[in-house]
Amino acid sequence: MSEFLRIAMAQFDFPVGAVAQNAERIIALIEQARDEHGADVVMFPELALSGYPPEDLLLRPGFLAHCQVAIERIAAATHGIVAVVGWPQSAGSVVYNVASVLCDGQVEQTYRKRELPNYAVFDERRYFEVDPNGSRCVFKVKGVPVGVLICEDLWFSEPLADTVCGGAELVLVPNASPYERGKHAQRDALLAERARETGAAIAYLNVVGGQDALVFDGASVVVDGHGRVHPAAAAFSDQWLVVDYMRSERRFVPLQWVAESEVSINALVWRAVVRGVQDYCRKNGFSKVWVGLSGGIDSALVLAIAVDALGADQVTAVRLPSRYTAELSNDLAAEQCHSLGVRLETVAIEPVFEGLLAALGPLFAGMAPDATEENLQSRSRGVILMALANKFGGLLLTTGNKSEYAVGYATIYGDMCGGYAPLKDIYKSQVFELAQWRNTVSDVLAIPPGVIHRPPSAELRAQQTDQDSLPPYEVLDGILSLYVDQEQSREDIIAAGYAAGVVDYVLNLVKINEWKRHQAAPGPKVSQRAFGRERRYPISNAYRG
């Protein structure tokens, strides 16, 4: 019986729908794990073959058939090593989320996921079934009994306990667990608890990469049979993680493992957003992006994110001044572009704005200017930016933040124009925090201090500031965090110390702007409750509370 078992954990990105390419890569990685790392077992993330989440691709018989052919091809290419590969298995009229054990050219066993998450961003019960006969997978490698579970199974005590009862002392857990603030500490605590409950050693592998609004952070870990969690692998990093499992002590010895100890929340959020932009562009065929740069904090932060994601040479900033644009705004935009090495173009919106006013003048005769004229300026900018992206290629990044999306402080078909919204799940107060943090991690100031310290303004009328229409952001974001992220009631929010009139004003804005959010571009989820697939409120909604 061997003293140790070498495990190679493939913390890589496997794009959704790219079945043939993923299969080729999995085969190549299996060979690399065997030949270069000397691994006895190689494991891949949850649904690595199809990518996660495949969503309604799982309703297409042809897609499932393609996955079946691909897993057989991977199995046929697997020799001299055991591979654990996640994929969607069709069995008659039902589909299972499975991990198959491949060895010696064939599928040896297949484990079917037992706990299907159906909350927040997850809707696995829409697609998958649980095997009514139950599922347990335990196999031996070099005399070591190894079990398999999948992601959500570990959040319940019974699946791991059952696997250990089946003889497993080491359990491999492939995952597709998206990032959100505080997730790392939550995962580590859970893993330690499960290991202590059962005495099992756990190899927890998470996928990495951006998929539309989800960003998977990797941060894979191993936990010994005493509940000790080894420092997590670098978050948002594509890498091999190779460990030796020492059977006599039920512990792991890392051989190839780029670990991280303490990483700040701001650093993790930054990496998540950068990876979200990077992968959204790469997976949708965009090599460059456009950013409308106003001299304000939101667009400045988006520009810095874009540069970190794609490089300065793939980013073009555009100033779009109007009669209300302060000279300081133009200067700060130019300062940032010079500092980051970004090309800056300037297109004045006055001719477009004046043309719209002239065209609408006869219909608007006798009516006082209001938000309509302000929105015309924003929509003039949207038309110009979309035209540039259309003519020269590239993706327009929109610059709104979560506070603005929540209360509708954004112009539909104006500053909401764009294909991806990097700040969509980041409140305005967090925007300032991230900007200040980003300036501490490099010699070059990514965001001019003048941008950070000036009062926020849409500059759509003279002497305008955001606080003309909204409570101070620390108040607004506090209310929104309780209402949106924590689903607290009006009464609970007032009891937390916020004035009833302000609470009513903010909650009404959230309600009446649902229609705008339904038309907003996707953006990376970094909070426990992001707008989009995990907050599905009706647009036509009479409930208030």
UniProtKB/Swiss-Prot annotation:
Biological processes annotated in GO: NAD biosynthetic process
Organism: Xylella fastidiosa (strain 9a5c)
Region feature Ligase, mapped onto this chain: 269-545
Name of the protein this chain belongs to: Glutamine-dependent NAD(+) synthetase
List of residues binding ATP: G292, L293, S294, G295, G296, I297, D298, S299, T399
CN hydrolase domain ranges (all copies): 5-247
GO cellular-component term (any): cytoplasm
Record field: catalytic activity: deamido-NAD(+) + L-glutamine + ATP + H2O = L-glutamate + AMP + diphosphate + NAD(+) + H(+)
The encoding gene: nadE
